[in-house]
């Protein structure tokens, strides 16, 4: 006799700070389509470029984010960096501050939409510690076949464009982070 029930194991990852739970799926051949893989890679690159602050590559990240944004999303992003905007990273952070971004997960509930969970870690030059914030971004995107300059095509070969971007904090206060003094990286 064969058993009537089949046990299917699942691995569930629970975020210690926010309590957010997600099912972890192993890699299986054919589980991720090429289109989804390309979309996820573009989404991750976009979030990292948009949320990272580092004076050494600020211009490249700004140009990439503006190029990869469309319509109101591009206008809102450009407004964020205008002089006199109190919410601008240029106003909030000194030039020696580095905010690094690490993407934790990308969920794509439907074509053209993604939810991205990520952390930002702020480190001020010379400080032994910093702060970690956890975020969730809801993104709508598309691939546009609109003509673009050749140098822009090198940065965005498939015409990836974010049409909506909303970022919300997962936690109410930043978590303190200590840095390894020799390496300048967060200790776990």
Question: What are the language-model segments listed below?
Answer:
Residues 1-10, 16-37, 41, 51, ...:
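Structured, amphipathic secondary-structure segments that form assembly/contact surfaces
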